[in-house]
Amino acid sequence: MQGLKPSQLNALNRLFNRRFPAEDVYTIEQARELALLSRALGRQVGLLIDRKGRVQMVLVGEAGSILIPELPRGRTGQERLRGLRLLHTHLSPDGISQEDLMDMLFLRLDAVIALNVNPTGDPVQWQAAHLLPSGAAGKPYHL
């Protein structure tokens, strides 16, 4: 990743090596670490986390968006979820964006969690969305 200081690269590497709760989204300490780093970078930071709580990929985007690269095929199928959740920061007070929802739908992510970061680098609010079983009335996700 170009343009990052060695200390920022080390912080991203530490995030990659962290274990996240398998059942919960994150701990308070993990939210603070992610929020502080995102604010210091001035960019969204995201983690793709598997169902066992292991970080599979660290993503660094721009201030207003994050790009998820092509993922390995693995557990794909029309009805199957990928077994990954996206935990990422938003530097604005917006909740989950339309882009976040489209990523979840098209990549078949288990869930998308947006952590809002205030100007001082504190996590202030989070919002989550997950896919609903096919055949559910209305939208294919719950926010």
Task: Go through each PLM region and give its residues.
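Proline-rich intrinsically disordered, low-complexity coils
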Residues: 6, 21-22, 69-72, 93, ...
